[in-house]
Amino acid sequence: MQQQPQPQPLPHSSYYTQTESELLQIEAGGTGLTFPPHRSEMAATSSQLQQASMSSNVASTATSSNLDVPSGGSTGSGSGGQTTSHFVSPLQRRHCQPPSHLPLNSVASPLRTASYKTAAAVAGHGFHHSHHQQLDFQRNSQSDDDSGCALEEYTWVPPGLRPDQVRLYFSQLPDDKVPYVNSPGEKYRVKQLLHQLPPQDNEVRYCHSLSDEERKELRIFSAQRKREALGRGAVRLLSDERPCKGCEESLSGGDIVVFAQRLGAQLCWHPGCFVCSVCKELLVDLIYFQRDGNLYCGRHHAETQKPRCSACDEIIFSDECTEAEGRTWHMKHFACQECEHQLGGQRYIMREGKPYCLGCFDTMFAEYCDYCGEVIGVDQGQMSHDGQHWHATDQCFSCCTCRCSLLGRPFLPRRGTIYCSIACSKGEPPTPSDTSSGPQLRPTHRASTSSQIARSPRRSGDRDRERESSRKANHGHGPVKGTGSAGDLLERQERKRMEAAGVADLLLGGGVPGMPRPAHPPPIDLTELGISLDNICAGDKSIFGDSQLTSSMPDMLLSKAEDSHSYQSIDKINLNSPSNSDLTQSTQELANELELDNDPVRELPHDGYEQLFANNRNTKKGHELQDMQGEEDGEQLDNRPLKEVRFHSVQDTMSRSKSYTDNSNARRRRRRRNQSRSSSEMQINQTNLRLHNAQTQAGTGTGAHNLLNNLDNCDVASICSTCSSSSSSDMDDYVYRLPARKHYGGVRVAYVPNDALAYERKKKLAQDPSLAAAASAAVPGVPGVMNESKNCTIS
């Protein structure tokens, strides 16, 4: 094929006309023949394609410029020989293509045929023979039966079809892809022409910055593709049943199908199945390229042989190229899409198939943190949800209420913010069940407390060892008070006092034979409580934030090993509200009273100490341990007013630690919750500090009687009828514990019932009238007191 020098046409228009002419040459059998186009022919066909792509009327192109005038080399006798080589006998003319030197846009249009006939009539005497054959071809064409049916409603139609066959063909295509004039289908066709048949793949003049070697290689590449792979589909009716090559469905006789000669005469496709095997788009104007039995558009067929630059959209003929993200670039074209800085060997970010340097990407596409408002750089971690973005840090990606980190944890989005739990989303403080992270807001000292409570008689050496172990256990919770704690100080004072009374040897020796040990561990001394509370509140810190809590609370619970008072303990005290003076006012008065209590104790000789327990044994004869203990308590408390110490505090909104109690405590405690919004008040009923002196009032004489009178006059003495009525049971060795509670935004009131033994005693009294009458006669007034204050209420 000879290279013809051509003038510079309008972009793309002459290129597509030339491509179609080459296809017509191939299918008409004149592959090796070339017809040099005349300048007027190029200008005419260029204007026609341009007007078709601009949605103009086809009828406006019916001018005399449609005449294809052969060049000087094709006139005379040579012209007749070349013209007759494109035609066959009239029997085969129905399925033949028009002459190759006719533009494709001039085929199958009555208006174009009329203009062609008019122009041919004035062509000159040298073209009469060719003119008669062309007129004969038009008259016998099935695409024009001179019936007056206009096909100009389409910008392109398959060649060689009657109007009804044209409509049958287009009925097999989607409506938005049928090339009606001034329709989306026409725009689709023009777009696919530019995309499927890129001119830079075939013509050097449409390429940029090609070297001489690359220009030569492009010409060879284009000629080889046209010679080996280029073809055009033929549309006609099917005569027998065949399967569709695209969808494998059966085609029956009479269906309109598309044939591709380069893939074989037996293969056919539905009109809608004649698509590119890569992009799956309809092959525009039925122009295809084949390779290995597959159909390709011009673009993707070229890419099967050479890489294409993603920047300039040209075939890469150089030996080196850049590959990234499954794409290829010329070495000099791999640059930032914004600043055009070359990115070879540098970091980059791909967005929508285009590379960007880090600076340009941050400027154009960086997100802002929803928490701190700062830019989230490409080097920083990012968390995104529903259009919101955060830095992937513990500070930014955290709960909106409690600020706990949500990295690696499920979160709850609500109203544009994120939370760690439902409680936090409602504005409530987190509970232990809602979150497992974060510091423990409420210190736990129950393990050390329960280890110091004696449930059976034991030696003072064992108590010292337990006390030492409890101090070591509490060392992790906060700083230990050391040897100057309130519990150690009072214990040494009591030991000196008992030695002066002559009882120290008795206690250290494990007890005198015949004299029983006290059945209960000693109670809490409120002077010790006052010292501990004073130490706690010295820095105006709450019980939840004070590091001295766990060191002072165990000291508060330490008891004097030599004493034999009944024992009750305080488990939970809220110290948020009261000041130092409020907390220690009542305890200071009690300390003054206790100084008076020491004198009768010092006057007790060995026989007095023995007499104290002898009276206790005589009292218990004939009754069970639990019943008689309650009656003795009631006898001492009959005519005495009830006192109590109250600790007022603000509402505790912090999460409480889990209560670690044994099964016996859990069985004798019930928990009920009542939701309210009022402020809470904690009321703690303290036990009688000198209950054994009251029990031995009849046997000890005037000293014990004076002690009881001192207790009556004490304004701060607290007597809980519940605790005193059940003080004879072994279950009272345990500390009364508040049940763990969950906060839901309001105050909870928990009612702690009596222990199981006291409850059982009440049932026995109710079932046995004789026992109830005896108890009422022995201790009048006690049942009334017990019924009135049966429960210790913590609100």
Curated annotation (Swiss-Prot):
CDD domains: LIM1_Prickle, LIM2_Prickle, LIM3_Prickle, PET_Prickle. Residues 52-66 have a biased composition (Low complexity). Keywords: LIM domain, Metal-binding, Repeat, Zinc. Residues 30-96, 427-487, 616-684 are annotated as: Disordered. Residues 650-662 have a biased composition (Polar residues). Residues 135-243 form the PET domain. Residues 459-471, 637-649 have a biased composition (Basic and acidic residues). SUPFAM superfamilies: Glucocorticoid receptor-like (DNA-binding domain). Pfam families: LIM, PET. Residues 666-675 have a biased composition (Basic residues). PROSITE patterns: LIM_DOMAIN_1, LIM_DOMAIN_2, PET. GO terms for molecular function: zinc ion binding. Residues 242-306, 307-367, 368-430 form the LIM zinc-binding domain. Belongs to the prickle / espinas / testin family. This is Protein espinas.
